[in-house]
Amino acid sequence: MKKDVKKVVLAYSGGLDTSIILKWLQDEYKCEVVTFTADIGQGEELEPARKKALALGVKPENIFIEDLREEFVRDYVFPMFRANAIYEGEYLLGTSIARPLIAKRQSEIARLVGADGVSHGATGKGNDQVRFELGYYALGDNLTIIAPWREWDLNSREKLLAYAEKNGIDITKKPGKSPYSMDANLLHISYEGLVLEDPSHAPEDDMWRWTVSPKDAPDKSEIIEIGYEKGDPVSIDGKKMSPAEILTELNRLGAKHGIGRLDIVENRSVGMKSRGCYETPGGTIMLKAHRAIESITLDRGAAHLKDEIMPKYAELVYNGYWWSPERNMLQALIDKSQEHVNGSVKVELYKGNVTILGRSSKDDNLFSEAYCTFEEDSVYDQKDAEGFIKLNALRFIIARKNGRKFD
């Protein structure tokens, strides 16, 4: 039985699926629909979404199109990269990190317009339904959540197209539109479906939209210097930029040199395995450079603790727990560790590779040439190492005296 909902805020892309959802909400719930379209760097013109919403009967005052690129990078991407977060050893969480912001703004708009419901276009098989809805529960005011893919009987492409045609929804395929299921933002672009559903099948070369093939990348490498303040990149080659500008420029450079392609099978939060291909050129550069500046500015214990908690942090982001107390606790610890992560990193970009050429920090460098030199020095007495080793071996010595063997 459907709940009585008067006004619903829909996460609306302007594409076929969410346009069908918009009409379906009007027909099935007899409710007023408010559309929210976020610009998080997907690289598409968003004004057509306004025209489509108007054509489907949405009031002009109920159409929200907002540029969230700076907020997305500053408050979501950068905090995640301070953690060096990678899911299952490879995935840089480009889709996962975008959902909390959309859910947050949807909940805020619902409060603003007095809506009592929210809706999204995520399917009942994927991770995004979890990410969106955990956000609604964390931030919304007793909102009714409508997930059409879990309710309707439009469970095939043919049925969706028939519904669209019946209701006058434009189903014209855009020129050059990919046949894959794609999701893009300023951090990455993802591809799923079709031949990718066979994990043994290599993706077609023309699938990749952002990056050139590494073998077709320039034969001459490019060297850049990234400046860091408190763990965040703030400049490229000495030029200060905003967070979104930094990521945009690193994307351009990385894509030019064939950097950031990834083909993986991941474990979804709902239990199944999924094959996905990703392009994350700027993020790949940022991760390598951030670890490099940390290598000279972080204390050993702090660095190792960060590495220990990173998989848990990444799992929380992947599974939709961005707003959870535990993620916020970990973030506070991570942000504390970044107070002295200041300096710059020289990076070489060449045919799909990111190579660190150097790292420096004027005020926070813990690398001491005086201590680590292989030449004669006056600050380190090598005899001190003998006692250190004996203390660390004490448990072995005691165990052997008690007859225990280690071979």
Curated annotation (Swiss-Prot):
Kindly list the places in or outside the cell where this protein is found, as annotated in its UniProt entry.
Cytoplasm
The enzyme class is: ligase
How would you summarize the oligomeric state and partners of this protein?
Homotetramer.
Q: What is its main location?
A: cytoplasm
Positions bound to L-citrulline: 91, 96, 127, 131, 181, 190, 266, 278
Q: Which Gene3D superfamilies match?
A: Argininosuccinate synthetase, chain A, domain 2 (3.90.1260.10), HUPs (3.40.50.620), Single helix bin (1.20.5.470)
Instruction: Report the coiled-coil segments.
Output: none
Taxonomic superkingdom: Bacteria
Which amino acids does the record list as binding L-aspartate?
A: 123, 127-128
The protein's Enzyme Commission number: 6.3.4.5
> What NCBIfam families does the entry give?
argG, PRK00509.1
- Swiss-Prot/TrEMBL catalytic activity: L-citrulline + L-aspartate + ATP = 2-(N(omega)-L-arginino)succinate + AMP + diphosphate + H(+)
UniProt family annotation: Belongs to the argininosuccinate synthase family. Type 1 subfamily.
Q: Which residues bind ATP?
A: 11-19, 38, 121
Q: Which GO terms describe its cellular component?
A: cytoplasm
The annotated pathway is: Amino-acid biosynthesis; L-arginine biosynthesis; L-arginine from L-ornithine and carbamoyl phosphate: step 2/3
User: Under which name does UniProt file this protein?
Assistant: Argininosuccinate synthase
> Would you kindly state one Gene Ontology biological process term found in this protein's UniProt entry?
argininosuccinate metabolic process
Any one GO molecular-function label of the UniProt entry: argininosuccinate synthase activity
Name the species this protein comes from.
Campylobacter concisus (strain 13826)
For this protein's source organism, the top of the classification is: Bacteria, Pseudomonadati, Campylobacterota, Epsilonproteobacteria, Campylobacterales
What InterPro entries would the database entry show?
Arginosuc_syn_C, Arginosuc_syn_N, Arginosuc_synth, Arginosuc_synth_CS, Arginosuc_synth_type_1_subfam, AS_cat/multimer_dom_body, Rossmann-like_a/b/a_fold
